[in-house]
């Protein structure tokens, strides 16, 4: 385990937020490494627990984690599931009305979201780039490494 100091907090969140009694396989090592700011390429089968390897570190670190996902349905499912658990997650994609998108942007600027899911093509839009640029400056910290789901 690379970062044992992070693991007790991670294990507590794993149990209290996600409802899992223990990590599976290499999850503990990956979560500790990512929570400490490290990069990871995680290859696991469907249902193997990949999402937890970035969702949990997002809750351990300050700022907002950016999750890049090409599948709108996956974004919607993950954000809905995280919200059910009390996690401050949001998405920005073409399914939102202009008013809904503005509300997500406002919440991001106020530091009220832990995870933001976006489609890759949204990262090419000037409005999104301006939003992200504004989040990088203090007081809101947008974590530097996006996650691709």
Language-model features, listed with the residues they occupy:
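Short, high-confidence coil segments that cap the C-terminus of an alpha-helix
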Residues: 37-40, 62, 112-113
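Conserved coil-to-alpha-helix start sites within the AMP-binding
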Residues: 48-53, 61, 72-77
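Walker A/P-loop
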Residues: 37-56, 66-69
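Short hydrophobic/charged patches on amphipathic alpha-helices used for structural packing
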Residues: 31, 55, 102-105, 129
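Conserved nucleic-acid-binding Ia/Ib motif block in the N-terminal RecA-like helicase ATPase lobe
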Residues: 11, 64-67, 72-125
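SF2 helicase catalytic motif II
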Residues: 114, 121-124, 128-149
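Conserved pre-motif I regulatory segment
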Residues: 2-45
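ASCE RecA-like P-loop NTPase motor cores
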Residues: 2-7, 32, 84, 113, ...
């Amino acid at each position: 385990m690379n970062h044992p100091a992070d693991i007790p907090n991670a294990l507590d969140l794993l149990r209290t937020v996600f409802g899992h009694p223990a990590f599976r396989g290499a999850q503990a090592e990956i979560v500790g490494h990512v929570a400490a700011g490290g990069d990871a390429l995680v290859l696991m089968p469907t249902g193997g627990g990949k999402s937890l390897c970035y969702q949990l570190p997002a809750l351990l670190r300050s700022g907002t984690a950016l999750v890049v996902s090409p599948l709108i349905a996956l974004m919607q499912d993950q954000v809905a599931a995280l919200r059910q658990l009390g996690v401050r997650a949001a998405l920005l994609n073409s399914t939102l009305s202009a008013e809904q998108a503005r509300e997500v942007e406002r919440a991001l600027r106020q530091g009220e979201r832990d995870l933001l899911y976006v489609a890759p093509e949204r990262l090419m839009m000037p409005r999104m780039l301006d939003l992200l640029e504004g989040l990088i400056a203090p007081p809101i910290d947008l974590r530097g490494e996006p996650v691709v789901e």
